């Protein structure tokens, strides 16, 4: 089975791409830009296209970007489809049980190593990640449904082939392009949702007032502006939104936006902005060298990009966080989590922040119709009604 599911903003609903045509797979870095050129032309010819680019495809666009080597996962995978239809989520709400590959002490030790690099002036920030793994009994549709019900996102995607499935409820836009207009929306800054309204508002205000999170967000925003500026028309870049807070059932997130105009190809855009600065650190080249040294495993699709092209060329890619890779042959799953490390980072707090991003796997996505009574107050309204 080959299929793709995406959120269609025009229909304001999830849609499934059907009637697959050709599939393009890259295991060699030189093939990645070629495939991007091919699928961009396919969309202009009236086909739908969906696929992913792995984090380790970075050197396809810039040999200075270092990373570990992927083994079984493609560097890029895209399929053409002839049509779309509405997609229905399942009601299955079973928790997904995965465990960290590394011990907590290993993550904390890596944070301390990064702080050494920061003290020496090698970098300003490094995005450190780890993996959760486990055997899988849930179906791909059930997993995707759980993730999307728990964390609804306009950037959610499901990709499935005979050998793998990828379920993403990413809240982060990598870039979208419609006509000449291109937008990126880097995300930096996370807080857990509170158990009750007062705690939730406290966590929200803490994120809103955090100088550390704002500094991180601004640092990454500057990198994104620089990356995007290379492929945008002179004078067209703007920053319409700074430090916006977005609520999800398990976390608060902080984003900023950059918008510009471009006439560059899809491959040229990727060569300038991939991987997204929010999942590497600053400066990107040195941060990725440190990531390759400290992280125990390749990232694969996690922190890469998943996306689609519609007939006519409208394009959207997410930053593939909150994303599960399922090996259908080995019947196991991998889910990445991470945190941005800066000079004043507290190792224990960074570990807690990264683990908070895994709550989507077990947080109950209760349908509202099960509630017979709900507390309402004029000041607070109904807590978590959104």
Q: Which residue ranges define each predicted feature?
A:
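Extended alpha-helical targeting/anchoring segments
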Residues: 1-386
């Amino acid at each position: 089975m080959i299929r793709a599911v995406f959120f269609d903003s025009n229909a304001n609903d999830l849609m499934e791409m059907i009637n697959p045509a050709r599939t393009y797979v890259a295991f060699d870095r030189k093939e990645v830009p070629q495939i991007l050129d091919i699928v961009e032309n396919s969309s202009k010819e009236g086909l739908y296209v969906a696929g992913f680019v792995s984090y380790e495809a970075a050197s396809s666009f810039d040999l200075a970007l270092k990373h570990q080597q992927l083994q079984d996962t493609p560097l890029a995978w895209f399929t053409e489809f002839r049509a779309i239809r509405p997609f229905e989520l399942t009601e299955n709400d079973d928790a997904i049980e995965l465990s960290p590959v590394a011990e907590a002490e290993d993550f904390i030790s890596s944070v301390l190593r990064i702080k050494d690099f920061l003290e020496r002036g090698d970098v300003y920030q490094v995005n450190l990640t780890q993996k959760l793994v486990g055997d899988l009994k849930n179906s791909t549709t059930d997993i995707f449904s759980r993730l999307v019900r728990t964390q609804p996102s306009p950037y959610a995607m499901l990709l499935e082939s005979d050998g793998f499935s990828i379920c993403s409820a990413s809240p982060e836009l990598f870039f979208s392009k419609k006509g000449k207009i291109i937008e990126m929306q880097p995300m930096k800054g996370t807080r857990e949702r509170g158990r009750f309204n007062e705690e939730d508002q406290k966590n929200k205000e803490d994120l809103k007032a955090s100088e550390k999170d704002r500094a991180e967000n601004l640092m990454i925003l500057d990198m994104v502006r620089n990356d995007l500026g290379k492929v945008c028309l002179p004078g067209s870049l703007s920053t319409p939104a700074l430090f916006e807070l977005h609520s999800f059932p398990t976390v608060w997130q902080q984003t900023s936006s950059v918008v510009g105009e471009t006439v560059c190809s899809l491959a040229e855009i990727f060569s300038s902005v991939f991987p997204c600065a929010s999942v590497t650190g600053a400066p990107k080249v040195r941060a990725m060298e440190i990531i390759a040294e400290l992280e125990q495993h390749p990232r694969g699709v996690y922190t890469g990009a998943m996306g689609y092209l519609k007939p006519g060329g409208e394009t959207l890619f997410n930053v593939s966080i909150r994303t599960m890779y399922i090996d259908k042959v080995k019947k196991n799953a991998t889910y990445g989590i991470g945190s941005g490390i800066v000079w004043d980072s507290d190792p224990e707090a960074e570990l807690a922040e990264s683990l908070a991003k895994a709550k989507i796997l077990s947080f109950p996505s209760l349908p509202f119709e099960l509630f017979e009574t709900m507390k309402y107050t004029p000041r607070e309204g109904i807590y978590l009604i959104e």
